[in-house]
Amino acid sequence: MAAKKSKTKSKPKSTPRSGRSMHSSTILPVGITQMTCVEDPRDNVKKQLALIEQAAKAGAKVICTQEMFTSQYFCQCEDHRFFSLAESIPGPTTDACCRLARKHGVVIIAALFERRAAGLYHNTAAIIDADGSLMGVYRKMHIPDDPLYYEKFYFTPGDLGFRAWKTKFATLGVLICWDQWFPEGARLTAMEGAEVLFYPTAIGWHPSEKKEYGIAQHESWETAMRAHAIANGCYVCAPNRIGREFIAGPDGRPVSKDGIEFWGQSFVSAPNGQVLHRASTNKEEVLVVDCDMDKVEFARTHWPFLRDRRIDAYAGMTKRFGAGV
């Protein structure tokens, strides 16, 4: 599927924990990972499980993977071959994650390509509690269709809505990649009680556009999610993949001469929008960041955006366009 495989030459970097120490019971150490993906899903799963274990040993209590970590980003083209990469949930990968969660007593959010039924596929995240139980799944609601991001060919939009998960350590919300551009999803998930929002992601540059648009594209991406943190008074965590991926078409040649250069820079934002830690653009990393959960209620009472919502005036939000158009 890829022109050539990427290889990890050294152990992925484990970033020192950011934030206050664990002396306070309100501290939640959150782990996010970023890595390259290669053609063989078995190699990707093996690497991802190792990174999850590394995060757990570094003290993380909630750990989230990047979007569709089991494969390369095959959505650069529309090709029926790639449906074979999907798997059921529960399935072999989520079973392995459940065992790891139970072994280390951690919550795991595992994002992968789901085969729900014959002809029905989703871009999905499995939520696994610290006892190893599969709590359920979130299915990506907003599905893009842009050059080299042809997801509508593969994924049926999610039908489970936006919800929060009361795990052992905190109430968590999960959305996926393209969802991050829509404030409605973040707001509805926060209204369900989420204290931390996770956005497993696969986003990068078209290399030919990077010089002109690259900085602005990345800043827009990060700013959108930091705004969700501010507007909803919660932490936001966005694990992204790295590496340049070329996907081969049926003729064996790359469908794009440039591929996609995934920009990494996974990050954690505080409820005030401050970036607590940001990963590199090109290194496999494990970030473990201490999140003070008291700051969620502090933000929501000092910046009372949830209090001041005018729900009586928002009926138009459920319309495709305004009455004056």
Residue locations for each model-derived region?
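C-terminal beta-strand edge segments of enzyme domains
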Residues: 3-5, 14-17, 21, 25, ...
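N-terminal active-site segment of His-dependent metallophosphoesterases
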Residues: 15-61, 198
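Short, glycine-anchored, charge-dense loop/turn motifs used at functional sites
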Residues: 30, 127-135, 267-276
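Active-site-proximal beta-strand elements of phosphoester/diester hydrolases
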Residues: 27-39, 124, 137-140, 164, ...
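Cys-nucleophile CN-hydrolase/nitrilase-fold catalytic domain and related Cys-dependent amidase chemistry
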Residues: 41-42, 49-139, 146, 203-234, ...
